[in-house]
Amino acid sequence: MPKSVIIPPGTSTPIAPFVPGTLADGVVYVSGTLPFDKDNNVVFINDPKAQTRHVLETIKTVIETAGGTMEDVTFNSIFITDWKNYAAINEIYAEFFPGDKPARFCIQCGLVKPDALVEIATVAHIGK
């Protein structure tokens, strides 16, 4: 199955051997996305809402670069560092998925950079 690598202009260069997204058989797989600027610095330190918005905007850019929209998202894997941020993260998350919600899970864990509060990996079916 052929795949296309998705690297939107202006996104950070991954700090490990992966790309922001891949497209195969009409499915976009978005790698775990952290609240990084283009130089891999954590943005909006101690602000779970702003970090979540930044992460979801980055995911949106990857999906749109592949030819899809956020309405095409079918699954999200959410990783958070502290349950106290759960409500704030969900508030912003709901803004990006106002209609039919995708399936998802959410777990608390440590992330690759201590100031990052949220990481999201996404699957979207764009039908191409």
UniProtKB/Swiss-Prot annotation:
GO terms for biological process: nitrogen utilization; uracil catabolic process. GO terms for cellular component: cytosol. PANTHER family: 2-IMINOBUTANOATE/2-IMINOPROPANOATE DEAMINASE RIDA, PROTEIN HMF1-RELATED. Its EC number is 3.5.-.-. It holds the Pfam family Ribonuc_L-PSP. SUPFAM superfamilies: YjgF-like (SSF55298). This is 3-aminoacrylate deaminase RutC. InterPro entries: RidA_CS, RutC, RutC-like_sf, YjgF/YER057c/UK114. It catalyses: (Z)-3-aminoacrylate + H2O + H(+) = 3-oxopropanoate + NH4(+). The keyword Coiled coil does not apply. Keywords: Hydrolase. One of its GO terms (molecular function) is deaminase activity. CDD domains: YjgF_YER057c_UK114_family (cd00448). Involved in pyrimidine catabolism. Catalyzes the deamination of 3-aminoacrylate to malonic semialdehyde, a reaction that can also occur spontaneously. RutC may facilitate the reaction and modulate the metabolic fitness, rather than catalyzing essential functions. It comes from Enterobacter cloacae subsp. cloacae (strain ATCC 13047 / DSM 30054 / NBRC 13535 / NCTC 10005 / WDCM 00083 / NCDC 279-56). Belongs to the RutC family.
